[in-house]
Amino acid sequence: MSSFIKGNARFSVLTEGCIRIEYALDRCFADDPTLFAVRSSFCQAEITEDKDTLTVKTKKLTLRYTGSEPFSRDNLSVAVHTSGKDTIWHYGDESRNNLGSTLSTLDGVNGERPLPDGILSRDGFYVIDDSGKPLLHDGWLKARPGEHKTDLYFFAYGTDYKSALRDLSYVSGKMEMPRKYFMGSWYSRWWPYTSDEFLAIADEYALHDFPLDIMVMDMDWHYQDWSHREGHPRALFGYGHAGENIGWTGYTWNRTLIPDPEKLIDSLHKKGLKVVLNDHPADGIRDHDEMYSDFIADLKSKGYKEEVPTVEEKVSAAERENLSRNIENYRFNAGNRDYMETFFKNAHRRIEKQGVDFWWLDWQQDRIYPHVHNMPGLLHLPWLNHLYYENSKSGNKRGMSFSRWGGIGDHKHPAYFSGDAATGWETLAFEIKMTATAGNIGCFWWSHDIGGFFDPVPGGQAECYVRWVQ
């Protein structure tokens, strides 16, 4: 077993090309997994001490740490032995020749954007910083002790980029095989379709002998403000989105458009289609939703009390105008296990029993509260991607998710969609580049809105649309 403690530092050799580097003030190191790292088994290495210097050597790298002080450029270095020459990294050095990876989303993007780092670099090495990120214990988040200051993963590979991706998969976990039908043809349009219109679309595909495998129902499958009619259930609590539409989140079928959801889903299944529902969960289950009473009762039976502070400047006008109702609603709380288990039970499981095959997580609410409650530094998106993917495995099915890219380590939760990009030649060119470089961080399954999402091309967009299809 190749793990060695020197003072407050621990070095763990995970593969010939990857070493974990930790520093903890109390010498209590982290063995639980994180959203990024899942492996803790070790690879053999040659470990020696000469006076005050520790040397850890494998076929691909040699690490040297002198003294016992916190890491600095002067006391920690790694030599990379690949491609016939040594490249030296000192603590704090940045990747100067990185080949890039991919953006989390193309929301609002119109043209080229800088790409974040991937694991592949012409430098022949890369460092992933997992410092401060929450641990996973018994399937849930656990804050990392404040004394655990540094947690780095050094990848050494030279020009052998395949070995870098192989080591990434070993350390962070392999990407599971997606469901077969995911590879098929999808139909998705943000439009208030009726049941008859959904069925007509499926029939038209069949009439033209064009394959269709997945029918996506965007936000209008549930009641929401823009299509609100007198007598419809209406949200009066929440932050909302896009001009204070607080019906952006919802879990009650719009019976005007889809009077019999089970019948519609069954009909689509008989036509060979899978059914996916759009989900903006940021406002959670509220009192206008048909499962509200069960949801509240379940939460109270677990002793749950509101713990997410209200962001006053983001509260919708509708909520402010209806404070006198005194109806109990809870803010969405992805950081609380009782809340999320109750949410999945009362929203997702109930609707999945009607035949829905999986969910499209359309998270856009980082503007309100980017970080998971009680977990500083953890964005909602990677954590929700993990939760949604794991919850999609019910009934012994393969996991299936559809969301924006959550960053390093999120390759374990396929697949991804790039969001609301502008229509235009510059965006198309960048999208092609970004899709290719996504592989540099293990993001292998990208879906894009064909033709973009907003802004027409001056002079017509027919050719741009056709090129997008290509």
Sequence positions of predicted segments:
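A low-complexity, Ser/Thr/Gly/Pro-enriched, surface-exposed linker/loop concept
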Residues: 14-52
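Glycine-rich, histidine-containing beta strand-loop boundary motifs that form or position
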Residues: 15, 23, 58-60, 65-67, ...
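Active-site-proximal substrate-binding groove within the catalytic cores of carbohydrate-active enzymes
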Residues: 21, 111-153, 162-165, 173, ...
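Short, solvent-exposed loop/turn and secondary-structure capping segments
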Residues: 32, 66-68, 75-77, 129-131, ...
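Catalytic and substrate-binding clefts that recognize carbohydrates or anionic sugar/phosphate headgroups
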Residues: 48-182, 188-191, 195-196, 202-207
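Aromatic-lined carbohydrate-binding/catalytic grooves of carbohydrate-active enzymes
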Residues: 176-371
